[in-house]
Amino acid sequence: MRMLAVATIALLGSATAALAAPASVSVSIGAELQAKAAKTLGVREVNDLATELRKTVERQVAKNPAYDGARIELVLADAQPNRPTFKQLSDAPGLSYESFGVGGAQIRGVAIAASGAVTPIDYKYYESDIRWARRGGTWADAEDTFQRFASDLRRGERVAAR
């Protein structure tokens, strides 16, 4: 009898969790970044970066039930690599992958709660200390920006006008 009660409670708990729809996250690439991608950075790399932003935000907001049923519409407005991209390396044969600099990204958009409340998003972070740039790959600082942004969003911290 006790086993039946435990099984019933577990089933009800899983059914409630299944009813809660996770947040819908969409990421588009801003017009200026699209032009920059076509000219210097590489379209495929910037598209991959947008996918990484979407996945990072999805993972973080899934940890906060306040975002269940919400829509998060983001625009990757700018991205700066730490190291040369494949396109930059192919366009300038004398350029070395060992070259490095500071990078980062800017994210804009809106978070639309299930209730309809709209919160504007404007977040950017660019590393200011070149000593940290040597440690990572091509998009290390941009990926750090995504992680910081997604963590702030998950915790409900203010993400507008940073």
Predicted segment positions?
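Gram-negative bacterial Sec-dependent N-terminal signal peptides
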Residues: 1-19
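A structural "domain/chain start" motif
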Residues: 13-53, 69, 76, 82-85, ...
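Short secondary-structure boundary motifs at beta->alpha junctions and helix caps
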Residues: 33-34, 38-43, 117-152
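Short structured motifs
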Residues: 43, 58, 92-94
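Extracytoplasmic/secreted envelope proteins and their assembly/folding machinery
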Residues: 50, 54, 58, 143-150
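Sec-exported extracytoplasmic/periplasmic mature domains
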Residues: 54, 58-62, 66, 154-158
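Surface-exposed short loop/turn segments
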Residues: 66-118, 128-134
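Functional cleft and adjacent loop/helix regions within the main domain
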Residues: 142, 153-162
